């Protein structure tokens, strides 16, 4: 449970963890505050004669036993208890400061998995054992989240005057040219391509939205007209909106095509400004006024304004000498948007700078930032009631947007990072690779039954990057990768590559280093990125962007989240629900833009949305996800929105549906306490600006939810949960390495393969054929050994035997007269003694080869992840630069088959030996014997709740591999 994973050094109670981390609206505890055991908190003001604590009162007080007062005054105190309580206050303050200090240190340093598991174990030991603590944590978490959801729902109901949904819909969807405000709030618009955005109180934000075309506002638009003048012309107003938007796409295309004919004639330094403000000599029949009108319309359409903040976009003056075409124009715009996310506010003052080549791997940027047109290009939805027309336009817009962003990434993937400012490389020929929108490739499932595995060679292209499905992640295909060559300057690229460890899409023949030509390494890095995402989404996205697996634009990340397998849908929701980071909010907007909710009931549209994104967790994140969904639903169904007085009603109703689904299908809610139809209707009374939602609508929603739960589609965690249910029987609890007592299914854990082997207690003694049969479940970080417990016609159950962490594991082969297909697993953690974990014998050589290949690759993946974690911490705390690709090439050569030699591991960890040992606290080193460098063998994982049973095999025979 998340509430048990506390990184503080001082263990705390579960209630402390919950209250300190999650309770909203509660003032944080003051460091100078009084203690809980100090009665009446002591009057902290100056003592006056009239005060109950004035010295006059002390003359009449008598001290009783233990310093308690015996006088008549209930508020009178003696001096001695005051000193005692003051000492208690100071002690409490010191403890609180220690807790805060340890929390700040733990947040800045990422502990290894075994240290995190050790912290959880210590909490469990302190508060009554594993079962008691986990049950308490689960109860607290469920109750607190339900309380927060209910409180947020009541807050949203009571604050309808805020009109947050109306404001966001009008501002962020100006491309619709359609206002959901009432007749009394609609103001004049300049229909010839210009638009006036209106706030909730009727005041104008500006006569024209600031855009690239400069200030084209009309003085007549500065003052709003009386609302009575427009109350009689609403129909005409909406018709004008519709006509304008229907012709908007064609006007934009014509304008772009005409501008692209003579884009080379405009000086590079003035390209962006001239494109929007100056007429071109070859516009053939298009006068200046019409061009300005269409330019203003185009700017209004593509500009995204959030929370009523209007800021001018960054000047796009880095046009360069690129081919004059519509594609170049799109690249310029999308490149500027990408630059806004990844640049650290550096100004480019050179004409030959290509903004689309910038790819700084930081997912965060300073808060004082300018908001530019970072929403997808050409996302135009007309306000037509026809769902067919809207769906068709939405699909075409999505294709245009995807193509534009993929073109803008051509230079980014082929150019490595440059210097501290991430400046683009100079002197590189700008070649446009042919990137086509490609539907997601169906991924093969890989479940090796009895050691057999079905593999298929995969040829990767674009951003597929050896993506694995939820079961198989170790397809070791060495086929040639179809990559696009971004530059012909190999020497400059290789020189830049040495300064930053990353992946660049180059043809196989253009690299001399075998690390780049090894498809196994490439796929391993991709899986590591998935694992990091499933642990910490922001860190995983940054890792994948750094290595070129994911475009560094909101649209590219949105496509990755929707199309790729191996991502936890729970973590997708965590990433998209993050309100603190602008990039996450933009990715969420792009994700919902890819979904079409036209002609769908609200609950069915919400079902489609939740199928891709798990809507649960903290109430604030759930609110953010539902808000984005409601916005998109209003865009896709303007006819439905007209039925309500306020678009906020859609948001409130969607939030109520989530509460209904949680209440109806939560196992913690008793059947007699589940929400009834009348309760559901009662909760939604008066939410539509004082009016009730039609009862028939609410009844239909309630019945559909009652018949069918809102569920999230299966991911790789679903299969791990199925395996967890199959493992039954006694699971010993109480030792350091627990059994499968509670949780095996975690967001980052996926099933690699399953096979049948035979355990060998003594390799020097024969045993009967088929004796000690074991069913092996190999996960990406754990090896679980089970035995068949019961067989039925349609199901098999397994009893748990042993489990081993893959970190520090070595896979060896042995053969003798008794066991021709022997497999030996040893612990090879640096600095620790080599320990034989277990011996197996495979039924045949083919099964042995397939199992050992998968196991070695999984071990190498775990080793690489731990190495990446240590390097990241060294960079963060000590400023140590990661080793270059050339320095790591020898290590990666050895780890290509999944086996790292003992000396290689020692060398990799000895690089930071000059630093403090605390800086490399990557393990339970401090808990092992004194004088030993390295970490002791963590033969089980607390995180997976697996029992480790000590096994002492006899002396191993001579290995012959």
UniProtKB/Swiss-Prot annotation:
The modification Phosphotyrosine is found at residue 909. Keywords: Coiled coil, Cytoplasm, Cytoplasmic vesicle, Guanine-nucleotide releasing factor, Lipid-binding, Nucleus, Phosphoprotein, Synapse. Residues 272-291, 364-374, 428-444 have a biased composition (Basic and acidic residues). Residues 515-708 form the SEC7 domain. Pfam families: IQ_SEC7_PH, Sec7. Expressed in hippocampus. One of its GO terms (biological process) is dendritic spine development. Residues 951-961 have a biased composition (Pro residues). Residues 469-487 have a biased composition (Low complexity). Residues 29-38, 938-947 have a biased composition (Polar residues). SMART domains: Sec7 (SM00222). It is found in: Cytoplasm; Nucleus; Postsynaptic density; Cytoplasmic vesicle, Secretory vesicle, Synaptic vesicle. GO terms for molecular function: guanyl-nucleotide exchange factor activity; lipid binding; protein kinase binding. Residues 133-162 form the IQ domain. Disruption phenotype: Mice with a conditional knockout in cortical neurons exhibit an increased density of dendritic spines with an immature morphology. Residues 772-864 form the PH domain. It comes from the Eukaryota. InterPro entries: IQSEC_PH (IPR033742), PH-like_dom_sf (IPR011993), Sec7_C_sf (IPR023394), Sec7_dom (IPR000904), Sec7_dom_sf (IPR035999). PANTHER family: GUANYL-NUCLEOTIDE EXCHANGE FACTOR, IQ MOTIF AND SEC7 DOMAIN-CONTAINING PROTEIN 1. Belongs to the BRAG family. Interacts with ARF1 and ARF6. Interacts with GRIA2; the interaction is required for ARF6 activation. The PH domain mediates interaction with lipid membranes that contain phosphatidylinositol-4,5-bisphosphate, but does not bind membranes that lack phosphatidylinositol-4,5-bisphosphate. This is IQ motif and SEC7 domain-containing protein 1. The lineage of its organism: Eukaryota, Metazoa, Chordata, Craniata, Vertebrata.
């Amino acid at each position: 449970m998340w509430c048990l994973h506390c990184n503080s050094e001082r263990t705390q109670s579960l209630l402390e963890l919950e209250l300190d981390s999650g309770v909203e609206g509660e003032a944080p505890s003051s460091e100078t505050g009084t203690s809980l055991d100090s009665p009446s908190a002591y009057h902290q003001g100056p003592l006056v004669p009239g005060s109950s604590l004035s010295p006059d009162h002390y003359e009449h007080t008598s001290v009783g036993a233990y310093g308690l007062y015996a006088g008549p005054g209930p508020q009178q105190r003696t001096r001695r208890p005051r000193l005692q309580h003051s000492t208690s206050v100071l002690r409490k303050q010191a403890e609180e400061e220690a807790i805060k200090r340890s929390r700040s240190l733990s947040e800045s340093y990422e502990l290894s998995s075994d240290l995190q598991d050790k912290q959880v174990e210590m909490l469990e030991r302190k508060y009554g054992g594993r079962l008691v603590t986990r049950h308490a944590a689960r109860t607290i978490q469920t109750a607190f989240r339900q309380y927060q959801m209910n409180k947020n729902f009541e807050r949203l109901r009571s604050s309808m005057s805020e009109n947050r949904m109306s404001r966001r819909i009008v501002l962020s969807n100006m491309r619709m040219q359609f206002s959901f405000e009432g007749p009394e709030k609609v103001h004049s618009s300049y229909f010839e391509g210009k638009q006036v955005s209106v706030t909730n109180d009727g005041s104008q934000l500006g006569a024209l939205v600031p855009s690239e075309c400069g200030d084209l506002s009309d003085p007549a638009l500065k003052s709003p007209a009386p609302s009575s003048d427009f109350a009689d012309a609403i129909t005409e107003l909406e018709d004008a909106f519709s006509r304008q938007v229907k012709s908007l796409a064609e006007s934009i295309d014509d304008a772009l095509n005409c501008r692209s004919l003579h884009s080379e004639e405009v000086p590079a330094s003035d390209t962006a400004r001239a494109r929007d403000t100056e007429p071109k000599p070859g516009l053939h029949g298009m006068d200046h006024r019409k061009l300005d009108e269409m330019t203003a319309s185009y700017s209004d359409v593509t500009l995204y304004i959030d929370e009523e903040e209007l800021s001018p976009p960054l000047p796009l003056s880095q046009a360069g000498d690129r081919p004059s075409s519509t594609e170049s124009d799109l690249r310029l715009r999308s490149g500027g948007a990408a630059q806004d996310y990844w640049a650290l506010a550096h100004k480019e003052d050179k004409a030959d700078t290509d903004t689309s080549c910038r790819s700084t791997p930081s997912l965060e940027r300073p808060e004082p930032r300018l908001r530019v047109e970072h929403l997808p290009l050409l996302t135009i939805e007309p306000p037509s009631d026809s769902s067919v027309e809207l769906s068709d336009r939405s699909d075409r817009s999505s294709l245009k947007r995807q193509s534009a962003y993929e073109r803008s990434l051509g230079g980014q993937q082929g150019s490595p990072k440059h210097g501290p400012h991430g400046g683009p490389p100079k002197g590189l020929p700008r070649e446009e690779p042919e990137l086509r929108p490609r539907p997601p490739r169906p991924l093969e499932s890989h479940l090796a039954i009895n050691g057999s595995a079905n593999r298929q060679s995969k040829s990767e292209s674009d951003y597929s990057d050896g993506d694995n499905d939820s079961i198989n992640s170790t397809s070791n295909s060495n086929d040639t990768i179809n990559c696009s060559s971004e530059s012909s300057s190999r020497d400059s690229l290789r020189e830049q590559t040495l300064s930053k460890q990353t992946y660049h899409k180059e043809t196989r023949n253009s690299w001399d280093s075998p690390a780049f030509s090894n498809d196994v390494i490439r796929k391993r890095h991709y899986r590591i990125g998935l694992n990091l995402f499933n642990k910490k989404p922001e860190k995983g996205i940054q890792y994948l962007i750094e290595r070129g697996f994911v475009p560094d634009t909101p649209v590219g990340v949105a496509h990755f989240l929707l199309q790729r397998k191996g991502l936890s849908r729970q973590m997708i929701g965590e990433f998209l629900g993050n309100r603190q980071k602008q990039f996450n909010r933009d990715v969420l907007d792009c994700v919902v833009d890819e979904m079409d909710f036209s002609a769908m009931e609200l609950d069915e549209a919400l079902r489609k949305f939740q199928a891709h994104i798990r809507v649960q967790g903290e109430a604030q994140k759930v609110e953010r996800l539902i808000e984005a969904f409601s916005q998109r639903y209003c865009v896709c169904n303007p006819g439905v929105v007209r039925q309500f007085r306020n678009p906020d009603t859609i948001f409130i109703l969607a939030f109520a549906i989530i509460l209904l689904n949680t209440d109806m299908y939560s196992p913690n809610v008793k059947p007699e306490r589940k929400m009834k139809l009348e309760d559901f209707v009662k909760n939604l009374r008066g939410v539509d600006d004082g009016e009730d939602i039609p009862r028939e609508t609410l009844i239909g929603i309630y019945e559909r939810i009652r018949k069918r739960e809102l569920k999230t589609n299966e991911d790789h965690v679903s299969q791990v949960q199925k395996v967890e249910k199959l493992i039954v029987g006694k699971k010993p609890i109480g030792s350091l390495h627990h059994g499968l007592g509670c949780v095996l299914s975690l967001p980052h854990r996926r099933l690699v393969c399953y096979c049948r082997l035979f355990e060998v207690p003594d390799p020097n003694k024969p045993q009967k054929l088929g004796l000690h049969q074991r069913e092996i479940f190999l996960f990406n970080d754990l090896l679980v050994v089970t035995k068949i417990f019961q067989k039925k016609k349609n199901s098999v159950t397994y009893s748990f035997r042993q489990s081993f962490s893959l970190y520090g594991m070595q896979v060896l082969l042995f053969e003798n007269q008794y066991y021709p297909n022997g497999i030996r697993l040893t612990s090879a953690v640096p600095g620790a003694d080599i320990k034989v974990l277990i011996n197996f014998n495979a039924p045949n050589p083919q099964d042995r080869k397939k199992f050992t290949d998968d196991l070695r690759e999984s071990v190498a993946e775990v080793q690489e992840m731990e190495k990446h974690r240590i390097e990241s911490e060294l960079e963060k705390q000590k400023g140590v630069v990661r080793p270059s690709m050339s320095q790591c090439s020898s290590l990666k050569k050895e780890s290509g088959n999944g086996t790292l030699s003992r000396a290689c591991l020692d060398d990799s960890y000895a690089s930071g030996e000059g630093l403090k040992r605390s800086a490399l606290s990557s393990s339970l080193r401090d808990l092992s014997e004194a004088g030993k460098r390295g970490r002791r063998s963590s033969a089980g994982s607390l995180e997976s709740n697996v029992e480790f049973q000590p096994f002492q095999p006899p002396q191993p025979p001579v290995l012959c591999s």
